[in-house]
């Protein structure tokens, strides 16, 4: 069931900037204060994965796209995959979790070029190893 919430034009523009410009490393999305639209909360060039994870709140939901760069074993080179992350921490309110769950597809379907998706409820589920496993799965 859809909540009727839609992403702003800035959401789509920042995603395109991440996807094509390769300057941004991640974009974090959330709901506007009136909960009527999806907005960009942060877009960053910081390549430090731990800094990205630190931007996710302990008690509030978010969506994010992270440009995950990794090295394949056996000398196969460096790859990049766009990962869509659904952050719905256990400590978020039930109402917030419901709004985010019902609004996810509104943003996800507008972000063409996502390779993989991770849904996480705890920081232990958002690790480089988890992203690597998803990004290299065939």
From Swiss-Prot:
Keywords: Actin-binding, Cell cycle, Cell division, Cytoplasm, Cytoskeleton, Nucleus
Superkingdom in the source lineage: Eukaryota
GO molecular function, a single term: actin filament binding
Subcellular location, record wording: Cytoplasm; Cytoplasm, Cytoskeleton; Nucleus matrix
Ranges where the ADF-H domain occurs: 2-136
SMART domains for the chain: ADF (SM00102)
GO cellular component, as recorded: actin cortical patch; actin cytoskeleton; cytoplasm; nuclear matrix
Keyword Nucleus: yes
GO biological process, one term: cell division
Membership in a protein family: Belongs to the actin-binding proteins ADF family.
Function: Controls reversibly actin polymerization and depolymerization in a pH-sensitive manner. It has the ability to bind G- and F-actin in a 1:1 ratio of cofilin to actin. Binding to F-actin is regulated by tropomyosin. It is the major component of intranuclear and cytoplasmic actin rods. Required for accumulation of actin at the cell division site via depolymerizing actin at the cell ends. In association with myosin II has a role in the assembly of the contractile ring via severing actin filaments. Involved in the maintenance of the contractile ring once formed.
Protein name: Cofilin
